[in-house]
Amino acid sequence: METACERLHVAQETQMQLIEKASDKLQDHILYWTAVRTENTLLYAARKKGVTVLGHCRVPHSVVCQERAKQAIEMQLSLQELSKTEFGNEPWCLLDTSWDRYMSEPKRCFKKGARVVEVEFDGNASNTNWYTVYSKLYMRTEDGWQLAKAGADGTGLYYCTMAGAGRIYYSRFGEEAARFSTTGHYSVRDQDRVYAGVSSTSSDFRDRPDGVSASEGPEGDPAGKEAEPAQPVSSLLGSPACVPIRAGLGWVRDGPRPHPYHFPAGSGGSLLRSASTPVQGPVPVDLAPRQEEEENQSPDSTEEEPVTVPRHTSDADGFHLLKAGQSCFALISGSANQVKCYRFRVKKNHRHRYENCTTTSFTVADNGAERQGQAQILITFGSPGQRQDFLKHVPLPPGMNISGFTASLDF
């Protein structure tokens, strides 16, 4: 057992040294995966013999050890094969030889040159997905390891092999639009290039092989040629699915980015919306018509037309945080995890000592939705006596703050 502990310690120490070394040589990464293989082989053998602790290391389940050992064996053998080719002399970082990158699409090949491609659906900036594309793919074939060039266009993510078979798509944005889009329109932004106004449901786009755009030839772009925009820049402003356009190396948007939420007029008259008014359907995001109406109004127009906020007094209408008369509150703040755990304990052990408790909330910045300050919850009480009983019997963990106040409804 002592020998197994020593071998396990050496394997783990080797991994730490190679990680800290940050080498760009493929031979060092082969040594790393050899150490991972040794570690999990020892843990698997120990678990099979009923050992749960080996040295200072807990032994995982045998299935976990077996799977990790298989991964290490595959990575070790693949890197050894790659090191015997002309690609073995290239610089390789440890991330380039990680299992997660090796198994990302397209699977079981080594990848370099990662960049992010942004796909915006329905012209809605809040409905955006990001995809990772690699410029170089090292793929194992029957003739050995070969280098393939990869990229993105209006159809999806692709790679081109040296055999000249054209673009091979391993991810298509049209299929993603079927999941995330309601109109079928999407635009693709890849560094300083944009493919705008693409529709996954239009007949001309669907009938062409591999989604070739109208600006391309009948055979599509030649293999290895840099992709061109699917539409001229001058026509982008009329496209419903195109918000960003290309302008040199920067990006210019056609108007301000819309806020993802749209509130009807008069909704700002009350801080608390009655829960008896359900929200039906998706929240609209097009704010352009409303912005034009607000610009045409005079500054005093809101004062001339007072907003009437309906007030529900019947308990049958639904839940009300504030009740008639004065209500007692306790505002509790702390870190997000502290507040969440505190609310859980209070609801479980002291539910009879208060009326209601809100979910965790944050104060947001003036611009955007960036959180400021600490997390907060608001607890309501039926009377000052109930609040005193709560403060007496419910301890407040260190690092959290509590403030008490009394409020009443104005309308």
UniProtKB/Swiss-Prot annotation:
UniProt cross-references to HAMAP family, sorted A to Z: PPV_E2
CC terms in the record's Gene Ontology section: host cell nucleus
Gene3D superfamilies: 3.30.70.330, E2 (early) protein, N terminal domain, subdomain 1, Papillomavirus E2 early protein domain
Assembly notes: Binds DNA as homodimer. Interacts with protein E1; this interaction greatly increases E1 DNA-binding activity. Interacts with protein L1; this interaction enhances E2-dependent replication and transcription activation. Interacts with protein L2; this interaction inhibits E2 transcriptional activity but not DNA replication function E2. Interacts with protein E7; this interaction inhibits E7 oncogenic activity. Interacts with host TAF1; this interaction modulates E2-dependent transcriptional regulation. Interacts with host BRD4; this interaction mediates E2 transcriptional activation function.
Segments of skewed composition (Acidic residues): 292-306
GO molecular function, a single term: DNA binding
Chief localization: host cell
Function: Plays a role in the initiation of viral DNA replication. A dimer of E2 interacts with a dimer of E1 in order to improve specificity of E1 DNA binding activity. Once the complex recognizes and binds DNA at specific sites, the E2 dimer is removed from DNA. E2 also regulates viral transcription through binding to the E2RE response element (5'-ACCNNNNNNGGT-3') present in multiple copies in the regulatory regions of the viral genome. Activates or represses transcription depending on E2RE's position with regards to proximal promoter elements including the TATA-box.
Annotated stretches, region: Disordered: 197-237, 260-314
Gene source species: Bos taurus papillomavirus 2
UniProt record similarity statement: Belongs to the papillomaviridae E2 protein family.
InterPro entries registered for this protein in UniProt: E2/EBNA1_C_sf, Nucleotide-bd_a/b_plait_sf, Papillomavirus_E2_C, PPV_E2_N, Reg_prot_E2, Regulatory_protein_E2_N, Regulatory_protein_E2_N_1, Regulatory_protein_E2_N_2
Residue ranges, annotated region (DNA-binding domain): 326-411
Post-translational modifications: Phosphorylated.
Keywords assigned: Activator, DNA replication, DNA-binding, Early protein, Host nucleus, Phosphoprotein, Repressor, Transcription, Transcription regulation
Entries under Pfam families matching the protein: PPV_E2_C, PPV_E2_N
Spans annotated as Transactivation domain: 1-202
Superkingdom in the source lineage: Viruses
Protein name in UniProt: Regulatory protein E2
Localisation: Host nucleus
